[in-house]
Amino acid sequence: MSFPAPKPKAPELPQKLQHKLECNQGAVRAVRFNVDGNYCMTCGSDKTLKLWNPHKGTLLKTYSGHGYEVLDTAGSYDNSQMCSCSSDKTVILWDVAQGQVVRKFRGHAGKVNCVQFNEEATVIMSGSIDSSIRCWDCRSRRPEAIQILDEAKDGISSIKISDHEILAGSVDGNLRRYDLRKGEMCADYLGSPITCVSFSQDSQCLLASSLDSTLRLLDKDTGELLGEYTGHQNHSYKLDSCLSEKDTHVLSCSEDGTVCFWDLVEGSLVLKLPVGKAAVQSLSFHPSECCLLTASEGGVQLWRGASYEEEGGS
C-alpha cells in the first residue's frame, strides 16, 4: 500500500509588512526595484527621483533635474545608470553614483508616461501621451530619437522590453508587440484603455490591465486569451500590475487601497492585501524573491512572505 503523494506546498505570498519608507517627495508616482532587487527607485510628484535600500529602509541618493513630476524610472543591467521620464516631456539618463544628469532627451510633444532600457542599456525607449514610442541612443550625442514608433492612436501608458521585443499598451485599447529583428508589429485589441503591460518571466505570455477593472493574460505568439482576472478596482488611474517572480500569481494595484493576488492558472482571487486608504498606484515585484514593493499615500511599503526572517532569509 502506498501513501498518496503530499500536495506541493502553495507558494508564499508577500503579505508581511517589513519596512515603510517615508519618501517625502509628494505623491509617489512609481516604485521600481533595480535589476537584482537590492535597491529601489521612487518617482515623486515633487520632481525628484530617489534611490533607496528598501531592505534597510535607507535613502541613498536624491536626483534632481526634471522640471515637473517624475512618472517612471528604470535601472540599467549593471546598476551604473538610470533613466527617468516626466510630465515635463523629457527623458533623463542619470549617472547613479555621481547623481548627475548624463543626457536629457527632448522630442515628445506631451508628458512621458513610461521608460525602459534595452537589455544592454544602450537604448532608452519612452512612451508618451503624444501616442508615440521614441528610442534614444545613450551613446550618441545626437539629440533626436533614433526611431519613432507611432502606430498608436492614443497615449502610450506602459512599455516593457524582452530581448528583441517591445510590448506597448495604449489608451486606444490596443496591446502592441514589436519584433525588432523581424521588423513586425502585432496588435491585440482589448476593448478598454490599457494601463499596464508585462511579459511573464518566461516571456511566453503577456499581461495587460485595463480601465474596465480587468487583467488579461494572452499567449504571446497566438494572441489567444488565456485568462481574465477581476475583483480589483481600476476605473480612473494608471495602476501597475505584474506577475510574481515564479509566474504563479498575477498581481494588480487597486483604487480601494489594496493589492490583489490571483492564482495564474485557476484565475481565483486568493488575497486582497490591505495597503492603505488611498489608491495603490504602483508596485514592483522582486526579480527572484517573495518580496513586493507598493506605493501609496506618499510612502513605499516592503512586503515579505510570512516565514521570512530578517536575518538569514526565508
From Swiss-Prot:
It is found in: Cytoplasm. Gene3D superfamilies: YVTN repeat-like/Quinoprotein amine dehydrogenase. It comes from the Eukaryota. Keywords: Cytoplasm, Repeat, WD repeat. WD repeats lie at residues 23-62, 65-104, 107-146, 151-188, 189-228, 231-272, 275-313. The keyword Coiled coil does not apply. Pfam families: Beta-prop_DCAF4, WD40. GO terms for cellular component: cytoplasm. Coiled coil: none annotated. Molecular scaffold protein for various multimeric protein complexes. Acts as a module in the assembly of a multicomponent scaffold for the ERK pathway, linking ERK responses to specific agonists. Also involved in response to hypoxia by acting as a negative regulator of HIF1A/HIF-1-alpha. Belongs to the WD repeat MORG1 family. This is WD repeat domain-containing protein 83. It comes from Xenopus tropicalis (Western clawed frog).
